[in-house]
């Protein structure tokens, strides 16, 4: 098999990275994708750094053994902790994801920028460096959201539980003064509709899925690794929990409009 015909690997701590996979599949419809969700060990955002690193390398090895030509780490926490180590150890293009703060700033809407993310993403040096670029000129507030990925892992993406969780998180803010909400965890796009309800659709909601997918395409094109055959690609999903329910949920989220 030529390298062009090999699949692209996607990895996340659970089902969240499927939000990025959806964007990548739209952008690269000829490609085959292998997705590995580590729902057995989700969430990563409250674990110790060394544990996240070990789990990320295990997932990467799983996908490398399937013969992938590139890897997308579709997990903000794993990216912030492990992306440099992965690039040093594997000789394929490796693309990570981080909170899309730059696009929020470039909107130039004024007002407060809220960054929703896991506690670990917000605590890592990579995020601190990102904040340093803008904190002098922008009103940016990190908003840790422990427990939210766990709800989404259960398939709870709407309804009273999600609404009340978000209502409580945003109760301290004046919605009129929020310009943008950056979704700093790949699980969060699945609750975007409820988030808009809670904030009365006042803020621009931004996630990094498209930017990450565009970077994947750019790197594959520059390396002459894009699939050239005129075909429709396929998506195959694996999960460390190894039960039908989580696989069914994964495909449901992939096909969710």
UniProtKB/Swiss-Prot annotation:
EC assignment: 5.1.1.3
Pathway terms, separated by semicolons: Cell wall biogenesis; peptidoglycan biosynthesis
Transmembrane portions of the chain: none
Enzyme class at the top of the EC tree: isomerase
Gene that encodes it: murI
Name recorded for this polypeptide: Glutamate racemase
Family as reported in the entry's similarity comment: Belongs to the aspartate/glutamate racemases family.
Entry-linked InterPro entries: Asp/Glu/hydantoin_racemase, Asp/Glu_race, Asp/Glu_racemase_AS_1, Asp/Glu_racemase_AS_2, Glu_race
């Amino acid at each position: 098999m030529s390298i062009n015909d090999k699949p692209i690997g996607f990895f996340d701590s659970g089902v969240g990275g499927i939000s990025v996979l959806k964007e990548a599949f739209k952008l690269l419809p000829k490609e085959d994708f292998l997705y590995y969700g580590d729902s057995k060990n989700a969430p990563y955002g409250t674990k110790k750094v060394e544990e996240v690193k070990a789990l990320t390398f295990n997932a990467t090895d799983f996908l490398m053994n399937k013969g992938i030509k590139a890897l997308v780490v579709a997990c903000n926490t794993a990216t912030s902790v492990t992306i440099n180590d992965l690039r040093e150890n594997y000789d394929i293009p490796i693309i990570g994801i981080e909170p899309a703060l730059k696009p929020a700033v470039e909107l130039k809407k004024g007002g407060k920028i809220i960054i929703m993310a896991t506690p670990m993403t917000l605590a890592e040096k990579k995020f601190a460096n990102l904040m340093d670029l803008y904190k002098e000129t922008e009103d940016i507030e990190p908003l840790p959201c422990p427990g939210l990925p766990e709800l989404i892992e259960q398939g709870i993406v709407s309804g009273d539980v999600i609404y009340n969780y978000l209502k409580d998180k945003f109760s301290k803010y004046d919605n009129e003064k929020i310009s943008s909400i950056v979704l700093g965890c790949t699980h969060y796009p699945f609750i975007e509709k409820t988030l808009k309800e809670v904030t009365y659709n006042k803020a621009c909601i931004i996630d990094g899925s498209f930017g990450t997918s565009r970077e994947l395409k750019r790197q594959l094109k520059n390396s002459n690794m894009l699939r050239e055959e005129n075909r429709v690609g396929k998506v195959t999903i694996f999960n460390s929990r190894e039960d039908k329910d989580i696989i069914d949920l994964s495909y449901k989220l992939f096909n969710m409009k």
